[in-house]
Amino acid sequence: MRITGGWSIVRQRLRTALRRPAAPTSSATNGRVPVRSPEELLAQPERLARLQAIEALTRVTPAHFEVLYRSALANYASYVQQLPASEAHHHAGLGGLLDHGLEAAVFALKLRRGHLLPPGAPTELIDAQADLWSYACFTAVLLHDIGKPAVDQVVTLFDKRGGALGPWDPWSGPMQAQTYEVRFVHNRNYQMHQHAAPLLARLIVPPEGFRWLASEREVLGAWLAVISGMPEDVGPLGQIVEEADRLSTAADLTGGIARQTPATRVRPLYERLVTGLRYLIDRGALQLNRPD
């Protein structure tokens, strides 16, 4: 694969975005959030630091990083914009889903270093496929919550004059609007977003990435099982993604005062506790007392 440009182009784009006199990416007026370019969204210092950490944790060349990793991150940022990752749990503020994805990607690539993949394979095969398995970890964790905007949230789009354009169709591609509002679906299924990921994967993973993942059947099979939310086939790849998700969630919940999106009303403590308990029960992380 011969590619020109590389990370220097990305740095230049990010420097340009930082010099623009645009409003901060977290700004929102009357509950409406501006649609931003991926360069603007990723130029925030903390996000830029995570981009650099992701690059440092990979072994690919800068040119390959641009095509395989950077393009996926730009697609992810363009798609999730500043949507929250949850209503009243982790990363519930503006940009929560983007921040969670980037942070979980860093954790996943760090955790991946502690695994020899595929398990039990000869050393030569492990070394030959090392970069591919790392990419599988990266893309799988980036996709683990990508279904939330499609099944857990309803996003309304507005034009530059403030006129309503109707609901966003998340199955078709990124938002095409000036601003947007988000609300959460009530009585939602907390597992459904996991099963939606394969339908949205091509909006995030570049064609070159898909071809690479499909080049090894064992890698592709494990990757598809993980992004489809199939716990019985989780394997080491799924364990890495789950642990990275937990670490990012824990870091946010213990990192200070939680934020919420403008459209989400401030909830009393008891209601947030009930929401959190319901979330844990629905995910199977907390079991109720059962008769013998």
What is each model feature region?
Residues 2-72, 112, 116, 198-292:
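Histidine-centered, transition-metal-coordinating active-site segments
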Residues 29-179:
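Acidic/His-rich, divalent-metal-binding segments that scaffold phosphate/diphosphate chemistry
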Residues 85, 116-268:
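Divalent metal-dependent catalytic cores for phosphoryl transfer on phosphate-bearing substrates
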